[in-house]
Amino acid sequence: MFKKRNLKWLSILATVIMAWVQLGGALVTKTGSENGCGASWPLCHGALLPQNLPIATIIELSHRATSALSLIVVLWLVITAWKNIGYIKEVKPLCIISVAFLLIQALVGAAAVLWQQNDYVLALHFGISLISFSSVFVLTLIIFDVDQKYEANKVHIDRKLRIYTWTMAICLYVGIYTGALVRHTKSSLAYGSWPLPFNDLIPHTEQDWVQLAHRTLALIASISVFLAFNYAIKHYQNNRTIRYGYTAALLLIILQIVTGALSIFTHVNLIIALLHALIITFEFGLIAYLIVLLLRSQRVEKVKQNAY
């Protein structure tokens, strides 16, 4: 059960399920299915499977079932990885983060159902689960020996690129929080047309302010990704890991902008809205991997300095 040969398929399964949890959470919010099971948790309307199953209940119940399954699969992956490849420096911290944030996510979700948290607290739910997904995603890349295939274990990342990468990660995470807040406050179509309602730029409602904040932070995050990409391409032309990684980050953020604009133009088409959530999930997972490389590079540098 916890054999090394199970690691690859198990890591793919865990990544897919965690991505599905992200999508499920977005679907619950987009369809207004948060109260699909009433104020009852972990049961649904006081039962394991309620007799009356309207669409809101089915969506909420499916999300809870997927979240429970993800906890089982991630725990299985974590135990297997810890046992078989725990000697790799990043594996144990990633295992701990994966499970810890998955549990925190479940508790925040339960609190939202039982005590009806306000929108600003509920928006944290997506960001917390995103950290858990990213940990599983990075663990999967390590399991598939991406480090060896692209010489990622030999990458030296200079101080400037580190600053660009951390700035990119922070801006993106704050932008993701405001995006979740847009969903929870039902502000998707607030503040007029995209990119700006030039005939009336002043926000008038809380929803307008939330939407404007999201667009502003999305712009800042996009600029930070472009600056990191520009520096990486100029100074790391011969390094495949850096070149591919930062190029992928730029392409994903462009797709994110496109789907964000299309969400408004299509009056929040459900498929486009879910695609918007999925793209940012993998974007943050990729940036998490770049941060792991950054920390590894820093660690190697310190070892070399201590050797002298």
Curated annotation (Swiss-Prot):
Belongs to the COX15/CtaA family. Type 1 subfamily. It holds the Pfam family COX15-CtaA. This is Heme A synthase. Keywords: Cell membrane, Disulfide bond, Heme biosynthesis, Iron, Membrane, Metal-binding, Oxidoreductase, Transmembrane, Transmembrane helix. HAMAP family: HemeA_synth_type1. It comes from Staphylococcus carnosus (strain TM300). Its cofactor is heme b. Residues 1-8, 89-93, 145-161, 237-244, 292-308 are cytoplasmic. It catalyses: Fe(II)-heme o + 2 A + H2O = Fe(II)-heme a + 2 AH2. Its main location: membrane. GO terms for biological process: heme A biosynthetic process.
